[in-house]
């Protein structure tokens, strides 16, 4: 297995995984957004999977849509577990603002083990995004900034 991180400069984090004849590219974009009404104290992860027609002829046309949905649903269930990723660390202001991580997964080559390779690629890209333990939300005049904890006292309400 080969894992490369920080391979797409226009993303917040990225990874490329090659497992035998399977190759997957993952990019993560982080944006501020609103938390879901059912989880006002947590951030959100949203997965999008694209099965490239170049990966296998079976993906031409609408051939890869069912597989893409299945992989997306599997990842959504896996990351809904607090021990996998603490989405509470993505909360900026409870009920108002959180980080939304958009995880885009592109299947470049399909040689089997798609679920395993996708899981590893997503985990590597999320770890490449940033370390949430080292960041702190700060509000100035209603705007949110994230700064390293070592450079500031952490607080979550504006003065």
Q: What does each of the following model-derived ranges do?
A:
Residues 1-159:
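Polyanion-binding surfaces on beta-sheet-dominated domains and ring/shell assemblies
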């Amino acid at each position: 297995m080969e894992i490369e991180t920080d391979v797409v400069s226009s993303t917040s984090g990225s990874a490329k995984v090659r497992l035998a004849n399977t190759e997957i590219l993952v990019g993560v974009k982080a944006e501020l957004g609103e938390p879901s009404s059912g989880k006002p104290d947590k951030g959100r992860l949203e997965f999008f999977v694209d099965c490239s027609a170049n990966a296998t002829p079976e993906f031409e046309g609408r051939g890869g849509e069912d597989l893409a949905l299945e992989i997306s649903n599997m990842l959504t269930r896996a990351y809904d577990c607090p021990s996998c990723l603490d989405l509470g660390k993505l909360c900026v202001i409870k009920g108002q603002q959180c980080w939304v991580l958009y995880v885009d997964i592109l299947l470049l080559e399909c040689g089997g083990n798609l679920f395993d390779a996708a899981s590893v690629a997503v985990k590597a890209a999320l770890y490449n995004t940033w370390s949430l333990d080292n960041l702190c939300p700060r509000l100035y005049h209603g705007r949110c900034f994230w700064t390293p904890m070592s450079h500031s006292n952490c607080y979550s309400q504006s003065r």
